[in-house]
A protein has these predicted regions:
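Hydrophobic beta-strand scaffold residues
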Residues: 26, 46, 114-116, 157, ...
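NAD(P)+-binding Rossmann beta1-loop-alpha1 motif at the extreme N-terminus of oxidoreductases
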Residues: 1-63, 88, 93
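Interdomain hinge/lid region at the active-site interface
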Residues: 163, 167, 211-267
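Active-site-proximal catalytic alpha-helix in oxidoreductases
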Residues: 129-137, 158, 162-194, 203-217, ...
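Rossmann-like NAD(P)(H) cofactor-binding subdomain of soluble oxidoreductases
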Residues: 52-54, 59-60, 67-132
Length: 267
């Protein structure tokens, strides 16, 4: 399949590489020319704008930091809408505000362009090995059409509902992950300061109700003092802020999310 890919950052670059490995023809764009050069060296074609991507592809993936970047990539100067043919499908795999996702989708629809939101979870390691979790919102028939393409970057791809639902699921994911990481850190610190071996505590609790993917992924790193970042904290703050905005819009209480965002901002 010929696919456009806009956004070759920490997540987008390995995701695009996996699409190439699966045999797709890729046309890519990013403002970071070094990232573009790396993907081009792997077999993609590099172009100078989103509009140039859309001129060649009727299936386009976007993977950019936040809502304004998605809007710019889709509807801004030099963006997808400038040259996209009616019937073009944009699969936005960024993590953005679900309300804004719906607005962008409505504006694209006026131009005959369909939007799906398909944010991912798993971080850079799972982007590299192609085992991301993808949560998708949009038309079910479009999801069915692109399921196999998405699976080339993922370990699981789940249809959640109408446009915007994918980002609602991602916000729920980010709330749980942030609070879980904080809880693991606090618990292991408690064990160490109490004079108990954190490794033995980890082994004791991981098979019980406290066991989780986050515990198994993060506890060993914490105990090894491996704090190499796999995700920028400002992006997680962005996700929590989007979660709070979404919660406030529907009067859903989110006190733990608010507290967690304050802690992250302090860091």
């Amino acid at each position: 399949m010929k696919v456009g890919f806009i956004g070759l950052g920490i997540m987008g670059k390995p995701m695009s590489m996996n699409l190439l490995k699966a045999g797709n023809e890729l046309v890519v764009f990013d403002f970071n020319e070094t990232a573009v050069a790396e993907v081009v060296a792997a077999g993609a074609k590099g172009v100078k704008s989103g509009a140039e991507v859309a001129a060649e592809c009727d299936t386009i993936i976007t993977m950019v930091p936040n809502s304004p970047h998605v809007r710019a990539a889709c509807l801004g100067e030099g963006g997808i809408a400038e040259t996209a043919k009616p019937g073009t499908v944009v699969i936005d795999m960024s993590s953005i505000d679900p309300v804004e996702s719906k607005k962008i989708g409505a504006e694209l629809a006026e131009k005959g362009i369909e939007l799906m939101d398909a944010p991912v979870s798993g971080g850079e390691p799972k982007a590299i090995d192609g085992t991301l979790s993808v949560m998708v919102g949009g038309k079910k028939e479009t999801f069915d059409k692109y399921y196999e393409l998405l699976m080339q970057m993922a370990g699981s791809v789940v249809y959640v509902g109408e446009l915007g639902s994918g980002n609602v699921a991602k916000l729920a994911n980010q709330v749980i992950v942030a609070l879980n990481i904080a809880a693991v850190s606090e618990a292991l610190t408690l064990a160490k300061k109490a004079g108990t071996d954190p490794e033995l505590v980890y082994q004791a609790i991981r098979g019980g109700l406290a066991g989780s993917t986050v515990l198994d992924a993060k506890a060993p790193m914490m105990m090894d003092h491996n704090f190499k970042p796999g995700f920028r904290i400002e992006l997680h703050i962005k996700d929590l802020n989007n979660a709070l905005n979404a919660a406030h819009a529907i009067s859903s209480p989110a006190p733990l999310t608010a507290e967690m965002m304050e802690i992250m901002q302090f860091l």
